[in-house]
Amino acid sequence: MSYSILYYSKQVQEDIMNLPDTLQARYIGLTTRMIEHGPNLGLPHTDSFGGGLFELRLKGAEGIARVFFCTMVEQEIVMLHSFIKKTQKTPKNEIIKAIQIKLNYENEK
């Protein structure tokens, strides 16, 4: 069973592809696994925020990044929002932004 990776917008895709090299390599490696095995890679790779919102956890030499995503019925994994993490906890405003983007995406479908 194969999944597909979609992006909420061109901007989201560009932001992810402009991550520092080691974070981008980690993203490509993990999304390849997600395509083959599904979105639930488990900790430390993915985590759930509830309500169908998940995060892809990227760690590399240049730091830590997070990519929020959701899954759709048709084996689709939709990348919603990414950011470079600078604090121990995921900032509340980044979570709120990801939830809003997810709701917008669902309303557009």
What are these regions (language model features)?
Residues 1-64, 73-77, 86-109:
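Basic, Lys/Arg-enriched alpha-helical interface segments
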Residues 67:
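Portal/gating segments that form or line small-molecule/metal binding sites
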Residues 70:
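Conserved Hanks-type protein kinase catalytic core
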